[in-house]
């Protein structure tokens, strides 16, 4: 009999539903038991965040900075600038639209009530270093490896990255549904889960519309550069979009993205280089989601969300997206460090960010891979071999 496999998104959705359902009748002692698990898991996650940054950013900087040519540098720069643009577009739209949706939502006191479910005990696992130190260390080490070309250090960094990715895949992601279950169990027990969910649904609808607008803008730029119809170019990329909706993986969608990019007239040399590279470093859709979710949660809790703070957050987030691992939920795991260090998100805010992000993981990935086709068109305009 064929084994039924549930992906991360279905498990997260089931965890949310069960958390709300069981929270209506489970006794406080059981809720405290899950609060104990959440406390330990959260401390473990906070311990891992600097290691995730070092493990992912260091080899990424070493590879991008190794001087493989102008094509690599320009592709990486365009991918980064597009990611930053997506974050700024998301912030401005969220600031204009979300206040109308979040009015009457959960207040600061309501959000804080979930923290009143105290664990039986907790285990302190302090991080080895803070997030900013880890980020600066990663840049210094990565650039140093690129400059000196040390194969031994690169091999060590690559193996450490494998350890980090394996930890995310085997320890963090499998336990996330239980963690999310505990969060919504506590929120239901304290009576404010429904108001949070109501806001969640409204936010998801707006973010979906935003990512469609972002794709249109990306292909309008590509169309202007190549002097071609942007909507026809975007239409050609739709098979890649719908494939990514099903796989939630940029890497798994590469064959389809590459095929549709070639159908758009991009040369085989440029497409073969840019599509696999952008599948790793171009996460405009993921950035759009993370910024919007962060703005929404900060509005819900009356936290300041001024433009200066968010600009710094978006610039750092763009770097973290370059280094994000290619696993479901990898982008939000890579972003936890800057969410905490720049925006001041605590354990509960980070848990809600994870839940909200993963419920939209598939169309964020679809936005990422479809946008790769737009970047390939621009790169091809200037780097196609003339015959």
PLM region descriptions:
Residues 2-26, 39-48, 70-232:
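Signature of multi-pass transmembrane helix bundles
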Residues 19, 50-58, 86, 90, ...:
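Alpha-helical transmembrane segments of polytopic integral membrane proteins
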Residues 33, 69, 73, 193-201, ...:
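Membrane-water interface of transmembrane alpha-helices in multipass transporters/channels
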Residues 35-46, 155-170, 235-243, 259-263, ...:
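Short amphipathic alpha-helical coupling elements at transmembrane boundaries
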Residues 40, 44, 57-58, 75-80, ...:
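Transmembrane helix-bundle signature of multi-pass membrane transporters/permeases
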Residues 69-75, 170-173, 263-279, 305-308, ...:
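Membrane-interface alpha-helices at helix entry/exit sites of multi-pass transporters
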Residues 102, 291-387:
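Transmembrane alpha-helical segments and their short flanking loops
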Residues 111, 234-291, 318-332, 359-378:
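Alpha-helical membrane segments and immediately flanking helix-loop junctions
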């Amino acid at each position: 009999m064929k084994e039924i496999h549930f992906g991360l998104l279905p498990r997260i959705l089931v965890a949310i539903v069960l958390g709300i359902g069981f929270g209506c009748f489970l006794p406080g002692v059981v809720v405290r038991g899950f609060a104990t698990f959440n406390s330990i898991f959260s401390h473990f996650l906070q311990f891992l965040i600097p290691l995730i940054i070092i493990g992912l950013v260091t080899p990424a900087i070493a590879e991008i900075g190794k001087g493989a040519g102008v094509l690599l540098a320009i592709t990486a720069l365009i991918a980064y600038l597009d990611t930053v643009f997506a974050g700024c577009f998301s912030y401005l739209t969220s600031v204009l639209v979300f206040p109308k949706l979040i009015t009457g939502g959960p207040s600061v006191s309501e959000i804080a009530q979930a923290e009143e479910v105290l664990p039986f005990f907790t285990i302190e696992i302090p991080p080895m270093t803070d997030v900013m130190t880890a980020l600066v260390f990663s840049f210094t080490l990565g650039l140093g490896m690129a400059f000196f070309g040390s194969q031994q250090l690169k091999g060590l960094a690559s193996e450490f990255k494998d350890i980090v990715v394996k930890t995310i895949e085997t320890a963090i992601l499998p336990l996330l549904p239980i963690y999310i279950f505990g969060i919504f169990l506590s929120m239901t027990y304290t009576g404010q889960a429904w108001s949070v969910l109501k806001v969640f649904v409204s936010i998801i609808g707006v973010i979906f519309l935003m990512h469609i607008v972002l794709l249109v803008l990306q292909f309008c730029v590509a169309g202007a550069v190549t002097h071609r119809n942007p909507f026809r170019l975007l239409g050609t990329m739709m098979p890649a979009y719908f494939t990514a909706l099903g796989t939630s993986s940029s890497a798994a969608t590469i064959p389809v993205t590459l095929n549709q990019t070639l159908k758009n007239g991009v040369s085989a040399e440029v497409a073969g280089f840019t599509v696999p590279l952008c599948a790793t470093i171009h996460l405009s859709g993921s950035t759009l989601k993370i910024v919007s979710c962060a703005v929404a949660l900060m509005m819900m809790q009356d936290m300041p969300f001024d433009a200066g703070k968010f600009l710094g957050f978006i610039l750092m987030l763009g770097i973290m997206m370059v280094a994000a691992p290619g696993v479901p939920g990898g982008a939000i795991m890579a972003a936890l460090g800057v969410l905490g260090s720049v925006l001041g998100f605590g354990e509960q805010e980070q848990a809600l960010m994870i839940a909200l992000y993963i419920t939209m993981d598939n169309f964020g990935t679809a936005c990422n891979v479809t946008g790769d086709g737009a970047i390939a068109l621009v790169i091809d305009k200037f780097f196609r071999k003339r015959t």
